[in-house]
A protein has these predicted regions:
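Generic multipass alpha-helical transmembrane bundles of integral membrane proteins
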Residues: 1-78
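C-terminal transmembrane-bundle signature of multipass membrane proteins
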Residues: 60-187
Length: 189
């Protein structure tokens, strides 16, 4: 289910020719990557970490997804993709340098699958309850299908190729992100 949701999420990335730099040339802006895509991506990526990286699900799966999402929602419109790349890179470097932080320290977190609070890669969990994994997987799949259906509907209504053209141009987030773009980019849009 995770793989299907992930593939659908790739097709939810619209407006590939609408990636701009900000006026001060410090940010990469992708105005068409609005809250619709961000929500679908966050749900899918949390599902991935929750299901496959149990000790990472809190830090990498939730905290790292919320940081760029909050930034995009409140002060960095259009900059979500760059913020996501930065936070992910910082986490990966930290996790490689201090791997025991997430695995064996007092800050380690295990998902409900490991109900007995024990994780050993050589021993399957005896009290495993994968119910939440299935619930999260279905939620992520449904969200990505809904966003993709919305993209198809908008593309047909606007008679646009959603991958070459931006299709969320009527959304407030898109307009605010484009205001941050360099003058040349705004004329092209």
């Amino acid at each position: 289910v995770n793989g299907i949701a992930g593939i659908i999420n790739i097709f939810c990335m619209t407006g590939w020719w609408g990636i701009y730099s900000s006026k001060n040339k410090q940010d990469m802006l992708w105005p068409d990557m609005t809250w619709c895509y961000i929500l679908a991506y966050d749900l899918w990526n949390f599902e991935y970490t929750y299901n496959n990286l149990p000790t990472h699900s809190w830090y990498c799966g939730l905290a790292l997804l919320l940081a760029p999402t909050f930034a995009n929602a409140f002060w960095n419109k259009g900059g979500w993709i760059q913020n996501r790349a930065n936070t992910l890179a910082l986490w990966c470097m930290f996790a490689q340098v201090f791997p025991l932080f997430q695995d064996k320290s007092r800050f380690s977190v295990l998902t409900s699958v490991y109900a007995d609070g024990y994780m050993d890669p050589t021993v399957p969990p005896t009290n495993a309850d994968p119910t939440m994994q299935g619930v999260i997987a279905i939620i992520a799949l449904v969200a990505n299908v809904c966003v993709f259906a919305s993209i198809i509907k908008r593309a047909k209504e606007q008679k646009k190729n959603p991958y070459k053209n931006e299709i969320f141009t009527d959304q407030k987030d898109y307009k605010l992100a484009l205001e941050r773009a360099a003058e040349k980019a705004r004329k092209a849009a």
